[in-house]
Each structure stands twice: as C-alpha cells, then as structure tokens.
Amino acid sequence: MDKLIIQGGTRISGEIRISGSKNSGLPILAACLLADSPMDICNLPHLNDITTMLALLRCMGVGVTINEKMCVEVDPTTLTDTEAPYELVKTMRASILVLGPTLAKYGKADVSFPGGCAIGSRPVDIHLSGLEAMGAEIAVEGGYIRARAPNGLKGAHFVMDKVTVGGTENLLMAAVLAKGKTVLENAAREPEIVDLADCLVAMGAKIGGIGTDRLEIEGVERLHGCTYTVMPDRIETGTYLVAAAATGGSVKLRDTRADILTAVLQKLEEAGAELEIGESTISLDMHGKRPKAVNLRTAPYPAFPTDMQSQFTAMNAVAEGTGAVTETIFENRLVQVNELNRMGANIKLEGNTALIQGVPRLKGAPVMASDLRASASLVIAGMVADGETVVDRIYHIDRGYECIEEKLQQLGVNIRRVPG
C-alpha cells in the first residue's frame, strides 16, 4: 500500500484550484440512469470512488466515454443489466445510489449491500422503506437487495425517521419517474442534494422545495439528457483552509464557493483566521499566528459537517487553549484520536466528545489512516509536527482527495508519496 511521507514545520502558502465534489458527482452519475438520452457530466474529480461508479455503470451496460472537454459522457440507452454486483459495490457505499433510479426506470434492481469507510453503521433501512412506500416489493437475500416494481413506482408521502443524505438522494431519484406526487419529509438539505436536484430539473424533473427539508416531486414520464457541471467540493475546500490555519499559513482557493461552507468558515474565524471571500475564491491568512481552540458539534446541514470534524480535531491539537469536539452523526468518527495522541496530542475521549488541550507542536510518527477524513487529519497533523510523519493506508485519502500531495506541494509542504 502507498504511504505519504511528510516533513513537518512548513507554513502553508500559495494558491490551488478546488476539484469537483465527489459527494455530488456520485449521485449525479447514478441519476444518469434515469435519462433516455446521453448525459455530459463536467467537473468530476479524478478519484477512486468516481472511477468505481463509472465501472459500475459500464458493468450495467451503460456507455461511458471521456470527451474532448474532459467531461464524462454517459449513455444510459445501452443498459443491459439492472444488477450492481458485489465485486464493485463492496468498495464503495455510494453504489447503493443506483437502486432508486434503476428501479424507477426499469421496474427492477438487484444491488449488493455496500462497503466503503469503516465509520459506524450506515443502515439503508430508510432507503428501502421509502421505496416500499412507493409500491416497490423488496427482498433481501444472499447479500443483495432485490427490488421489484413491475407496474412502476407510485407517488407517496414519506417521512424519514432521521436525516439521511443517501436516503434522500435515492428516494428523490426514484420519485422523479413515479406516477403522481411524492412528498419527502425530514429530507437532508446538504448542498450536494441541491446539486443533484438541480441536475434532475435540468433533465426535466419537477421538484419543489429544493434546499428545504420538504421535497415535493411531481413524477414525469421521461427525463432527457443534459450537460451538467458538478459543484465544487466543500469538504476539500474546508480541508485546505484548516491545513493553512493549523500551520499558521495562508492560502487562496479557486473555483469554490463560500455559501456552502458557512458553519466551517465561522469556526475558522473563531480560530483567528482572516478570511476574504470572492465570487469563486476563498482566501485565508493566519499571519503566522497559532490558531485558537474552538468548540464544535457536528449535525446535519446547515450545521457543522461531520466530514470536517477530523480536520478541526487536528487543528485543535496544536491550538491555544482547550476545545471540545462532539460527533453526533457517526459513532466511530473519533478513531483518529489515538493516532494524534501518539504524535503528542493531549486528547481525552468522553463518549462521543473529544476534549482537546492544545500543545505547541506535535511530534512526527508513523500513523495509520482508518477512514477518508481521519486520514486527512493525520496529514494535517504531519504538517504541524516536528520531524517526519509517515501516513499508511492512504487508499482512504485517494477516495476523497484529488492529487492531495501535488496540491500540498504547490502550497510548499514537504510531502511525497511512496509506493507500497
């Protein structure tokens, strides 16, 4: 397995471009299955998860080509199979997103139970009960979800037991081709869901309440292809901002948006960062200062995102003062704490809260990534540590960050990848 080797002690400085959003690109690629003509999807990041989703579409018989504009052309009209096999699904949870659109368009879908990061239980019960409310017959056997709706799906009023991003996406994609009106209550409001909904509307879907927790969908008979540009990655944006803040440095990020990161930017200002917001840029400057510790609690959007918790935990480890970080979304999301403590951090766990007493510097050490965002926190920790840090099992980081070592090198970080 590849490793990242980081020589700590450099203040970040420079300018980089932010990639397209993985968490938006994956459901939008799944939504291509709903169209009856080709789709052009632009600004997709070059990431393992995106590659896996494209491989899954190809496995189903869908035509996938990269055009001269570096957009991915997806032709769903060549689909030959409504099964998503275990071999592809096991590596990525987002594979479950083909369930709703495949069932809605073709009346049947067989999707293996998904894999992905080891950050706690992410059950798909809400996906399944929502589809059943829309008239689907669902059996779970042999590790597969087997869904049938031979007469098509029917509109329904469905209240989700808890806020679920994947569940909202799956049910939204199923509802756009269902007969009649569907109302989804307690829907997730994440910007990636807004992006998916905007793409579906561009394909001819009728969706009301976009960006709220109540989505109203009037089913249509068909959806057409379109050209759509995926939104910037707000978590990648936040990660590089935190890296600059933790190192006392400065950074300018291009091709991003501040309006989808309000809670994160607020916490960075609390930490002492000076921010400058442009139309598609965000600049941060710490003026060489050590960050101040911040308290935060993760919650569904528009509150503080769970995907940014690990990075702020790493920043708090070298901040002035004491910060409390409470994780309410995923139960195993504080696993990076043990690795940070091995680097000299002073972090105590109390249930789902990390109490972090900042220290001036960490010490380089060999550490191991356990999930995508925890691995990003260890890279940040390596930047603020004395000496060399070796981050192992970085296949996690390659699932969510495009060219991370190249981008950090552009910002002056002494980092290199060593093949396993």
Curated annotation (Swiss-Prot):
Repressor found in the keyword field: no
Its pathway, per UniProt, is: Cell wall biogenesis; peptidoglycan biosynthesis
The catalytic activity, as recorded, is: phosphoenolpyruvate + UDP-N-acetyl-alpha-D-glucosamine = UDP-N-acetyl-3-O-(1-carboxyvinyl)-alpha-D-glucosamine + phosphate
Q: Which GO terms describe its biological process?
A: cell division; cell wall organization; peptidoglycan biosynthetic process; regulation of cell shape; UDP-N-acetylgalactosamine biosynthetic process
* Entry binding sites for UDP-N-acetyl-alpha-D-glucosamine: R93, D307, I329
Stretch forming the signal peptide: none
State its Enzyme Commission number(s).
Answer: 2.5.1.7
Provide the binding site for phosphoenolpyruvate: K22, N23
Q: What is the main EC category here?
A: transferase
According to the UniProt entry, which residues carry 2-(S-cysteinyl)pyruvic acid O-phosphothioketal? Answer: C117
InterPro entries per UniProt? Enolpyruvate_Tfrase_dom (IPR001986), Enolpyruvate_Tfrase_sf (IPR036968), MurA_subfamily (IPR050068), RNA3'P_cycl/enolpyr_Trfase_a/b (IPR013792), UDP_GlcNAc_COvinyl_MurA (IPR005750)
Q: Where in the cell is it found?
A: Cytoplasm
Q: Record keywords: Nucleus included?
A: no
Q: Which GO terms describe its molecular function?
A: UDP-N-acetylglucosamine 1-carboxyvinyltransferase activity
Give each disulfide bond as a residue pair: none
Which family does the record claim for this protein? Belongs to the EPSP synthase family. MurA subfamily.
- Which PANTHER family does the record associate with it? UDP-N-ACETYLGLUCOSAMINE 1-CARBOXYVINYLTRANSFERASE (PTHR43783:SF1)
Protein function = Cell wall formation. Adds enolpyruvyl to UDP-N-acetylglucosamine.
Which HAMAP family does this UniProt record tie to the protein?
MurA
Its name, as the record gives it, is UDP-N-acetylglucosamine 1-carboxyvinyltransferase
Provide the species name.
Answer: Teredinibacter turnerae (strain ATCC 39867 / T7901)
